[in-house]
Curated annotation (Swiss-Prot):
UniProt enzyme class: translocase
Classification via InterPro entries: NADH_UbQ_OxRdtase_su1/FPO, NADH_UbQ_OxRdtase_su1_CS
Catalytic activity: a plastoquinone + NADH + (n+1) H(+)(in) = a plastoquinol + NAD(+) + n H(+)(out); a plastoquinone + NADPH + (n+1) H(+)(in) = a plastoquinol + NADP(+) + n H(+)(out)
EC number: 7.1.1.-
Name assigned to this protein: NAD(P)H-quinone oxidoreductase subunit 1
Assembly description: NDH-1 is composed of at least 11 different subunits.
Role noted for this protein: NDH-1 shuttles electrons from an unknown electron donor, via FMN and iron-sulfur (Fe-S) centers, to quinones in the respiratory and/or the photosynthetic chain. The immediate electron acceptor for the enzyme in this species is believed to be plastoquinone. Couples the redox reaction to proton translocation, and thus conserves the redox energy in a proton gradient.
Keyword Transcription found: no
Annotated source species: Trichodesmium erythraeum (strain IMS101)
Protein family (similarity comment): Belongs to the complex I subunit 1 family.
Length: 372
């Protein structure tokens, strides 16, 4: 396990230095990860919603949000406030308990996944040794909430949307997990920190996208399907199902689905950046930069600069992938449900299995290049 920045230890030690007891410091830490996670995820969503509106407008030769704040940057905030004050309506024949639990079960695992994703040089809330497995386990809870919402709404369109969403999620969960296993096999670890560190040796040439091109394509297609982005937005196909499992939702319950969708998109882009694009690593290795300037890697100003650049690089890679996902929305037509399931079960799953076996063979044959 890499011994980098530990937010928990640093936070508790800072409070102890201020004169608080260790027990009180640990108690004060308990709500901190959740608050930090919610703030980071919410800010990421606001930026993503604004980007989607502006990119969509550009694709359609419109201006987009312009007058709500500078360049319309306050438009996403206005959307959120509008939903906050909307009436929360529960259909007369719906199951009130399941109807309320559905959005919560969908939203909570997405937020919890941010606990194990690094935003910079070892800057992670919880550096778990099984971080990737935890994320896969959390993401597999979502279909239960989607089915619950579709069933509890007592609406045929909602039920069909929930069934489609569950089928889609299950179909693409397996290829996604196999693609991640190939990366974990090369990195000899399931920790997100260790996976990024393993890509740090040769700059851009050391990133996993070059050693796992098939895995990268499989993972990117699978996360787009998991996020229900076009061309895989069949659970919400307006022409067929009105709004799918969200049809009967209003107010804050609908806002939870809206929020979870964009939080999941940012999270998926972050994970692609971490697993395949070197995370916080810059295209040029730090060793090369320090040699150019003739300074030691342990020089404080170089370490601070490198840590700051790491956060910037992570966000740049993440929002580049968000940009591509938004652009795909206006580029590709929606696939049919049979095409969607055929792609997952008959193409991505066999290719993901072949990719995993190929990775194992290359790891044994060329251990230096494939993390042996």
């Amino acid at each position: 396990m890499n011994s980098g920045i530990d937010l928990q230890r640093t936070f508790i030690q800072a409070l102890v230095d201020l004169g608080l007891s260790s027990e009180i410091a640990k108690t004060l830490w308990l709500p901190f990860p959740m608050l930090l996670m919610i703030v980071v995820a919410t800010v990421g969503v606001l930026v993503t919603v604004w980007l989607e509106r502006k990119i969509s407008a550009a694709a359609q030769q419109r201006i987009g949000p312009e007058f709500m704040g500078p360049l319309g940057t306050l438009a996403p905030l206005a959307d959120g406030l509008k939903l906050l004050f909307k009436e929360d309506v529960v259909p007369a024949k719906a199951d009130p308990l399941l109807f309320t639990l559905g959005p919560v079960i969908v939203a909570v695992p997405v937020f919890l996944s941010y606990l194990v994703v690094p935003f910079g040089q070892n800057l992670v809330i919880t550096d778990l040794g099984v971080a990737i497995f935890l994320w896969i386990a959390l993401s597999s809870i979502q279909p239960i909430g989607l089915l619950m919402s579709g069933y509890a709404s007592n609406n045929k369109y909602s039920l069909l949307g929930g069934l489609r969403a569950a089928a889609q999620s299950i179909s693409y969960e397996i290829p996604l997990a196999l693609a991640v296993l190939a990366v974990a096999m090369m990195s000899n670890s399931l920790s997100t920190i260790d996976i990024v560190e393993q890509q740090s040796s040769y700059g851009i040439l050391g990133w996993n996208i070059w050693r796992q091109p098939l895995g990268f394509i499989i993972f990117w297609i699978a996360v787009l399907a998991e996020c229900e982005r076009l061309p895989f937005d069949l659970p919400e196909a307006e022409e067929e199902l009105v709004a799918g499992y969200q049809t009967e939702y209003t107010g804050m319950k609908f806002a939870l689905y809206y929020l979870a969708s964009y939080v999941n998109l940012v999270l998926s882009s972050l994970l692609v950046a971490v697993l395949y694009l070197g995370g916080w690593e810059s295209p040029l290795p730090v060793e090369l930069i320090s040699n150019w300037f003739g300074v030691s890697e342990t020089t404080p100003w170089l370490q601070i600069t490198n840590a700051t650049l790491g956060i910037i690089m992570t966000l740049l890679k993440t929002y580049l992938l968000v940009f591509i996902a938004v652009l795909l929305r206006w580029t590709l037509p929606r696939v049919r449900i049979d095409q969607l399931l055929d792609l997952g079960w008959k193409f991505l799953l066999p290719v993901a299995l072949v990719n995993l076996l190929l990775t194992a063979a290359l790891k044994l044959t060329f251990p230096f290049a494939f993390g042996g």
